[in-house]
Structure formats: structure tokens, C-alpha cells
């Protein structure tokens, strides 16, 4: 058929560098044109089984060219720069995307990729669907929050931890996807004054006293990891620490521009409401019991 011939002609050999781009190409139903990805591209399931070329910041020219790609789509940190020069010098179309880490940025990314792959209508539809889901998450969260505490409209407080080592906790601040999700839901981020991903000192965490803490799933190893984090010196004395309201989130959803953005909001909303339910119970507890503690 004509349509089939047209498709054959337009078929690309695509390399995606960055989990978000891989996910978007699959969401646009062009996953069968992806010949290789970087090592962070583990979703959807089919993407796991595609040739992996290593970490997207450190791709090798040989590795990329060996796949005979026609197109390389890369997240902003894709590199090194000499690889990009050599690959485009070899005649591969290279497009590097740098988008703001928020819902608007995700929509733009989807639309740009859709345009590049000649599926603009599909991309427009996907972007609109994601926005609509995000709006529904916001409505549902606000409604449920109001039901718990009709009088108390103080924002919930949260923190998103991306790594934990001897130097302290590294958290998601301004211009990150967690911040964008918190903003939409009206949740206050304890690291909002920091730019990007930064170390936060223990006092700042205690002072903010988060109701709930989220952590990037990739940093958790073993069953004890979450309870271990609840006992962290910065966290133990906070509301979230005392009640061990520390929840893991899929790193690709929570840190990247994923088409699963609304599902990420849903996970944040669900855990924030658990914390709210617990607070409601605690605050209605009798003063006598409080004294006994």
C-alpha cells in the first residue's frame, strides 16, 4: 500500500540518549525505530531489551556509529561534545534538547520530538492528555486535602532526597521535576531556595520539618534502606521521620521529563494524603496523651 511505502521511506534508525526521550519516542508509537539507547532507558519494558550504549554523558563515537543510526536524540547533558561533533560529522542527524524541568517543558519536549519524527498530531494529543491528567490530580488532591482539614489550609511540607552520603543529603530544589510537581499540588518544598540538586544541611531539614519525604528509587539498596533513612540525623526528628513517611519514587518519573508525569503527581499526592491523615489523628489526640509522650 501507499501508506506502507511511505512509512518504509520515513523509517529512521534512532538512538535515544536519556530515559525521557526513549519514553517519549515509545509513547509516540515509534519504539520500533529505536536501535539503541543509553543505559538509563529502562521504560517501557521493551526498551530494556534494546542495545545499551552506556551512560548518556559518556557515549563513545564508535559505539554510536556502529548502530548505523540516521538520528540521535539526546537529553541536554548528552556527551561528550567531541562524540556529538564526530557523529554529526559522519552524517547522523543529532538533536540535543534542553527543556525546563516542568510540565510546560515536558509538553514542549513531546511536541518538538513529534515534529522531528513527523507525528505532530500524535504528539499534540499526548501532550494534551498528560496536562489533563495532571489537572485531574491537582483537583483530586485539593478536594481530599480540604476534606481532612477544612479549617487548616497551610500547605503540606515535603522534601525530595536524591542521594545520601557522608557529606549529607542531596535534595531537589528549584528548577527540578519534584519542585514542579510540588508546585502544581500546592506542596511546599523545603529545598525551594536551592537551585537544582544541592546538599542541604541537617538544620535546614529540621527547621522545615517535612510532613513527608520522597526519595529517588535508584538510591535505595536493600529492604532496610527506607527505615534506615528515617533514622538519618536530619530526618529522625521531623514529622516524616518520626512516622517514617519516607516514600520511594521511580527516578525516571520523578527526575526526568517523563510522559508518566501525572502518575508521579499521583504518587506524591497519595503519600501526602497519608501524612495528612496521620497528622489529623495526632492533632485530635487528647492533650493528656501528648504530655505522656
Predicted feature locations:
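Short secondary-structure boundary segments
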Residues: 18, 76-77, 99, 194-197, ...
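A ligand-binding cleft/hinge motif common to bilobed small-molecule-binding domains
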Residues: 78-89, 214-230
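Short helices/loops that flank or line small-molecule/ion binding pockets
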Residues: 61-68, 90, 201-209
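A short, structured surface patch at a secondary-structure boundary
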Residues: 13-67, 71-77, 81, 190
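Structured C-terminal subdomain patch of bacterial secreted/periplasmic proteins
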Residues: 12-13, 105-115, 124, 135, ...
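Flexible loop/hinge segments that line or gate small-molecule binding clefts
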Residues: 43, 84-112, 116, 246
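Basic- and aromatic-lined ligand-binding clefts that recognize polyanionic substrates
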Residues: 12-25, 122-185, 254, 281-293
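His/Asp/Glu-enriched short active-site or ligand-binding loop at hydrolase and phosphoryl-transfer sites
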Residues: 38, 174-197, 217, 247-248
